[in-house]
C-alpha cells in the first residue's frame, strides 16, 4: 500500500513542499530566512487577530483602546509588543532574505523574484498602515506626510490624496480604512507567499555556489526541517529578548502622545525599517523627484536580473562584486542612520552622497565589475 502522505490530494502538496522536496545539499543558514518569514507572518496574523478583538478604529478611542489592551487585557501588553517588535523581526528577515538573493544570484528565478518584490511592497504598505493605527503623534503625522507625497503626481495628485484620506485631512475615515486594509493585507501576503513557493518549487532552490545542484539533492525532511527549527528558536529568542527587556527600543517616544493635528512633532520620521528609503526621499529637494527616487529605491530590485552581466550566477567566486555588495550594505546602513537625523548641515550632504552611491552601485558599478570579472576568467 502506498503511503497516504504521497497519495492524499492535500497531504501530497504538503509532502512535495516540506517533506520529500529535493533540496541542494549545500544551502547555508542564509536559506533559513524564507521559513523565518513564514513564521513571522503567522506570529503577526495571530497577534494581530487578538489585538483586533480589543482595538477600536475611531479617532476618539483608538489611542485609549491600545492603552486599554496594554493595561487591562490579560497579557495584552505581551500581544501588543509581540506584534510591534514582530514587525521589526519581519523586516530584519526580509532584508537578509533579499540580500541573500542579491548575493547568490537567486534573482535569476524571474517569477519567484518578481513575486518577492511585490511581496516586499505589500509588507511595506501593511507596516505603514499598521503604524497609523495606535493614533499617536508619529502615527498621525507619519500618515499625513507619507500620503501627502502622492500629491506630487501631476494633475491627479491632490484628488488622489483626498480620495485616500476620505476628506480634506487625515481623520476618522482614514483611520477606519487603514485598519480595514491592515487587516486584509496579511492574508493577501500569505496567498502571495504561497505563489512565491509554487514558482520556487518549479525550479528548485538555488545554492551558494550558483551551480546546478540536480546531481546532489537531499530530502528536505529531516535535514532542513531541523535546521529551520533551529532558526525559528533563535528568531523567537531574539524576539522575546526584545519584547520582555526593551519593548520600546525600536519605537518612537512621540507615539505615546495622542495624535494632535495642531501640534507638529519636531522630527517626523517613520519606523527604523523605512529610514533608508526616507533618507533617499529627503535627499532630493524636488517633491516629485523625491517620490520617484523613493519608489525606485525599492522598484530597482525588479530590474536587477536585467543588470546581471556576469557569466557566473553567484558572487561566491567574484571578489570585486563581493566588495561592492558589502559597500552597498554599508551604504544602506548609512542611509538608515541619516533617515533618523534632522535635516541640517552634515546630514543633508551625507544623505545625498549615500543616495547617489546607492543607485550608482546597483546600476553602474556592479554590472561593470561583473564584466571585468568575466575578462579575468579569460586569462
Curated annotation (Swiss-Prot):
Heme b b566 binds at residues 97, 196. One of its GO terms (biological process) is mitochondrial electron transport, ubiquinol to cytochrome c. A ubiquinone binds at residue 201. It is a multi-pass membrane protein. Gene3D superfamilies: Cytochrome Bc1 Complex, Chain C (1.20.810.10). It is found in: Mitochondrion inner membrane. Binds 2 heme b groups non-covalently. Its main location: mitochondrion. Coiled coil: none annotated. Pfam families: Cytochrom_B_C (PF00032), Cytochrome_B (PF00033). InterPro entries: Cyt_b/b6_C, Cyt_b/b6_C_sf, Cyt_b/b6_N, Cytb/b6-like_sf, Cytochrome_b, Cytochrome_b_C_euk/bac, Cytochrome_b_N_euk/bac, Di-haem_cyt_TM. One of its GO terms (cellular component) is mitochondrial inner membrane. Keywords: Electron transport, Heme, Iron, Membrane, Metal-binding, Mitochondrion, Mitochondrion inner membrane, Respiratory chain, Transmembrane, Transmembrane helix, Transport, Ubiquinone. The chain crosses the membrane at residues 33-53, 77-98, 113-133, 178-198, 226-246, 288-308, 320-340, 347-367. GO terms for molecular function: metal ion binding; ubiquinol-cytochrome-c reductase activity. Heme b b562 binds at residues 83, 182. Its cofactor is heme b. Belongs to the cytochrome b family. The cytochrome bc1 complex contains 11 subunits: 3 respiratory subunits (MT-CYB, CYC1 and UQCRFS1), 2 core proteins (UQCRC1 and UQCRC2) and 6 low-molecular weight proteins (UQCRH/QCR6, UQCRB/QCR7, UQCRQ/QCR8, UQCR10/QCR9, UQCR11/QCR10 and a cleavage product of UQCRFS1). This cytochrome bc1 complex then forms a dimer. Heme 1 (or BL or b562) is low-potential and absorbs at about 562 nm, and heme 2 (or BH or b566) is high-potential and absorbs at about 566 nm. Component of the ubiquinol-cytochrome c reductase complex (complex III or cytochrome b-c1 complex) that is part of the mitochondrial respiratory chain. The b-c1 complex mediates electron transfer from ubiquinol to cytochrome c. Contributes to the generation of a proton gradient across the mitochondrial membrane that is then used for ATP synthesis. PANTHER family: CYTOCHROME B. This is Cytochrome b. It comes from Uropsilus gracilis (Gracile shrew mole). The gene is MT-CYB.
Amino acid at each position: 500500500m502506498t503511503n497516504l502522505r504521497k497519495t492524499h490530494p492535500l497531504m501530497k502538496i504538503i509532502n512535495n513542499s516540506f517533506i520529500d522536496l529535493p533540496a541542494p545539499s549545500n544551502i547555508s543558514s542564509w536559506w533559513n530566512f524564507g521559513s523565518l518569514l513564514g513564521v513571522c507572518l503567522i506570529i503577526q496574523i495571530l497577534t494581530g487577530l487578538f489585538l483586533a478583538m480589543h482595538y477600536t478604529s475611531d479617532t476618539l478611542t483608538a489611542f485609549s483602546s491600545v492603552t486599554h489592551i496594554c493595561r487591562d487585557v490579560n497579557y495584552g501588553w505581551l500581544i501588543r509588543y509581540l506584534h510591534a517588535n514582530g514587525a521589526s523581526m519581519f523586516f530584519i528577515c526580509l532584508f537578509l532574505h533579499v540580500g541573500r538573493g542579491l548575493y547568490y544570484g537567486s534573482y535569476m528565478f524571474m517569477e519567484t523574484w518578481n513575486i518577492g518584490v511585490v511581496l516586499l511592497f505589500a509588507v511595506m504598505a501593511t507596516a505603514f498602515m499598521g503604524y497609523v493605527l495606535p493614533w499617536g503623534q508619529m502615527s498621525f503625522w507619519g500618515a499625513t506626510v507619507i500620503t501627502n507625497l502622492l500629491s506630487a503626481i501631476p494633475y491627479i495628485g491632490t484628488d488622489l490624496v483626498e480620495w485616500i484620506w476620505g476628506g480634506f485631512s487625515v481623520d476618522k475615515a482614514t483611520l477606519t480604512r487603514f485598519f480595514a486594509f491592515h487587516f486584509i493585507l496579511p492574508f493577501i501576503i500569505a496567498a502571495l507567499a504561497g505563489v512565491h513557493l509554487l514558482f520556487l518549487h518549479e525550479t528548485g532552490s538555488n545554492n551558494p555556489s550558483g551551480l546546478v545542484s540536480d546531481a546532489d539533492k537531499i530530502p528536505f525532511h529531516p535535514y532542513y526541517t531541523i535546521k529551520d527549527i533551529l532558526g525559528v528558536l533563535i528568531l523567537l529568542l531574539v524576539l522575546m529578548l526584545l519584547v520582555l527587556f526593551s519593548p520600546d527600543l525600536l519605537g518612537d517616544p512621540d507615539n505615546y502622545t495622542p495624535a494632535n493635528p495642531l501640534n507638529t512633532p519636531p522630527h517626523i520620521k517613520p519606523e527604523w525599517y523605512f529610514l533608508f528609503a526616507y533618507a533617499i526621499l529627503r535627499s532630493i529637494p524636488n517633491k516629485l523627484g523625491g517620490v520617484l527616487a523613493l519608489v525606485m529605491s525599492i522598484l530597482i530590485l525588479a530590474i536587477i536580473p536585467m543588470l546581471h552581466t556576469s557569466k557566473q550566477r553567484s558572487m561566491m567566486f567574484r571578489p570585486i562584486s563581493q566588495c561592492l555588495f558589502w559597500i552597498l550594505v554599508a551604504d544602506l546602513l548609512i542611509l538608515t542612520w541619516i533617515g533618523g537625523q534632522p535635516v541640517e548641515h552634515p546630514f543633508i550632504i551625507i544623505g545625498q552622497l549615500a543616495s547617489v552611491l546607492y543607485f550608482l552601485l546597483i546600476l553602474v558599478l556592479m554590472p561593470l565589475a561583473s564584466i571585468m570579472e568575466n575578462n579575468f576568467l579569460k586569462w
